[in-house]
Amino acid sequence: MVIGRDRCYDIFRSNGLCQRTSRKRPKTTNSNHNYYIYPDLLNVAPKFVATRLGAMVVADITYVNTGQGWAYLSLLTDASSRAIVGYALYKTLETEGPLKALEMAISFYEKYHIDMSTLIHHSDRGVQYCSNKYVERLKEHQINISMTQCGDPLHLSLIHISEPTRLGMI
C-alpha cells in the first residue's frame, strides 16, 4: 500500500502519534524603539568578509528552556574563527545580559592584544544592542557598530547555523 505524506500525517495525528508543534516561543528582538539604528557595514561593495581574528564579532540572543521557564542566552561570536568570545545567560531580555557578554568579548580581545578599533560589532536592531549603555561601551573601545537593515536574518546566520552544535545539542 502506498500513501502520501499528508495522509500519513493525518493517520498519525488521529492516533495521537504527533507532537504538538504550536508551542509558544519567546520573542528575542524588539526593533520597535526610538534608539539610533546604525548602518549595515556588511552590505557594502565589495562584500565584507572576516579574514582574521578580531575583524568582526556577531551578536545575537537565543532562548533556552531551563525546565523552570525561558532564559535568554546572549552570544558574541568571532566571525573568522567562529569562537564564542562572549556569553551570558539571563532570565530577562534586559540589556544586562548582552552587556555582560560584550564585557567578556572585550576582555578576550584585550587578552590577546587585538586592536578593537578595526573590529566590527554586527547585530540585529534589537533594543538591547541600540541602548545607550551598550553603544557607549562599544564606543569606549572604538568598536565599529553595524546592524542588519530591514530585518535581514541572513547576516546573523553565523550564529544560528552553529548554535545547536556549540551548545551541545547535536
Please place each PLM-identified region on the residue numbering.
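RNase H-like polynucleotidyl transferase catalytic core
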Residues: 21-27, 120-125, 139-158
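Basic, flexible linker segments flanking DNA-binding modules
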Residues: 1-51, 152
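Short conserved beta-strand segments at catalytic cores or DNA/RNA-binding microdomains
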Residues: 61-94, 103
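Two-metal-ion RNase H-like nuclease active-site motif
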Residues: 42, 54-64
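Single conserved hydrophobic/aromatic residue that forms the stacking wall/gate
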Residues: 159-170
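Active-site beta-loop-alpha junctions of metal-dependent nucleic acid enzymes
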Residues: 87-113, 130
